[in-house]
Amino acid sequence: MIFLRLTTLVLLFAMVVVSNRAQPHGEGKQEPSAEVRSQLFKQVLADFRDLRECIEQEEGGARAAQENMSVEALDVNHDGVAEYEVQMSGGCACGMVNCSIYIYRKTAQGFESILDDASGLGVEVLKTSSNGYSDLLVEARDTAATRAETTYKFDGKQYREAKATIVHVETGERKPASRRLQFARGTSSTTVTGRVSIALPDTFLLGARAGQVMTVKLSAPRKSVRFLVMSPTTRNLVADNAREWTGTLPETGDYYIIVDADERNSTYSMTISIK
């Protein structure tokens, strides 16, 4: 899931309410039977090999993981038949706070996953819907100062990430977790402006090919404003505190350009070009 990668990038760089909610986590949901819990646990392990292999190495193994698994029934397609929110716990499925979240629906063959790339504190079912299924909101801890809110919409087969936002916990200020840069037709550069802090950076995505040359020029009234360029495999390409950088791109894919500052909000202007 792209937001997970972006969260990792922002944390690396730091080291170098919500409308339309209908059903908060845990409210209006039913506890499934022991048989359903067992079937869902087996299905999760069958679907996610890395998780299964990790759990097998943990103290207590699969039995402890199943006991600690959270399963709640909900009806996201309003047909009177339950779907199930499954949240694993422990080091194999969780970071410091956020844990992997899955949603399964019943089929003639058993259970199939319709959401398998979410991580957070739980699922909220929204009033809005897509293709007959309620939209979902997953809230996650991002940093000590911010939380992440990711909206998922059903595309007819699976829930897909539709929007990701970071929110400052104290001020309520919010911004997109990332924005995609696009050049105007016939041009090879663009200029963006914004206001950032260490808690609320700006993250841009720019698709490029290996061998192209990227140039980034940053202008800001405060020296604390800085930028970082990360390759598609999250390799840092820029020296600390650089205000200008030119480099030949090593990979084909989406490059991440992150701008942040210190605790104070700071304005900036940045020009990016690719040749």
Language-model features: locations:
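Short beta-strand-plus-loop segments that form exposed binding edges in beta-rich domains
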Residues: 140-143, 258-264
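Edge beta-strands of jelly-roll/beta-sandwich modules across compartments, strongly enriched
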Residues: 202, 263-275
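Extracellular beta-rich ligand/substrate-recognition surface
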Residues: 58-66, 191-200, 237-238
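Acidic/hydrophobic-patterned starts of short beta strands in beta-sheet-rich repeat architectures
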Residues: 77-89, 130-140
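Short consensus segments that form the blades of beta-propeller domains
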Residues: 61-62, 90-96, 141-143, 217-218
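Acidic, Ser/Thr/Pro-rich low-complexity intrinsically disordered segments
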Residues: 196-260
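Acidic, small-residue rich beta-repeat scaffolds with periodic aromatic anchors
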Residues: 5-8, 12, 21-53, 125-177, ...
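Non-catalytic extracellular/lumenal accessory regions of secreted precursors
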Residues: 173-205, 211, 275
